[in-house]
Amino acid sequence: MSLARGLERRLEQLVDGMAARLFRGRMHPVELANLLIREADLALHILPVGPEAPNAFAVTLGGEPAEAEARDAVERELAVAVEQTAWERGWRLPGPVRVSLIVGSGPAATAAVRAAFVAGPLPPWARLLPPGRPPVEVCPNRAVVGRSSQADARIDDAEVSRRHALLWREAGGMWVADLGSSNGTHLNGEPVAEVAEVVDGDLLAFGGPSFVFRSV
């Protein structure tokens, strides 16, 4: 799966902007982004909730040192490339994506990538809004909704199973699946038998409690 065209354009613009010197004689930023994504794909962990990808990348480039400002800009864009690919492919990430560019010895055209899993807080990509109560934030992709203290989106209600349902983003959509809960998961009043697509404003019920689904 190739990078989205809009993301490719942003990476290509780095070559014409302040990062031009950084990429002179080196791997093109689009190629570098694809290299990171391949490394992430090779390092996937398959969890009970689905695939989890590494989120910390150290990229060693050969050649002459580059300005810190240009390096920072490239690191940000490469992180966005990994994040957007994770959403598109349905990968879970253990924390925010961090990319570090290190200029070392060796030919300028070489690049080496080390990938790691580093836990950290993630911003919410959706919220579950119950009537008259605080919202429940959905932060990681492939988030477990449930009563357990280990659930990603915790609902403290006896009618909710410890691991009740799964919420995630993939292939441009948002999805819900029941995890074999005791009281079932319902989408707009209909039981979720396997996997169902969720859109902004839908009504989700986990056992008894109901929530309006809002993407962030």
Identify the residue ranges that each predicted region occupies.
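Forkhead-associated
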Residues: P135-G208
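Intrinsically disordered, low-complexity acidic Ser/Thr-rich regulatory segments
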Residues: M1-L3, L7-A158, W168
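Edge beta-strands of extracellular beta-sandwich domains
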Residues: S210-V216
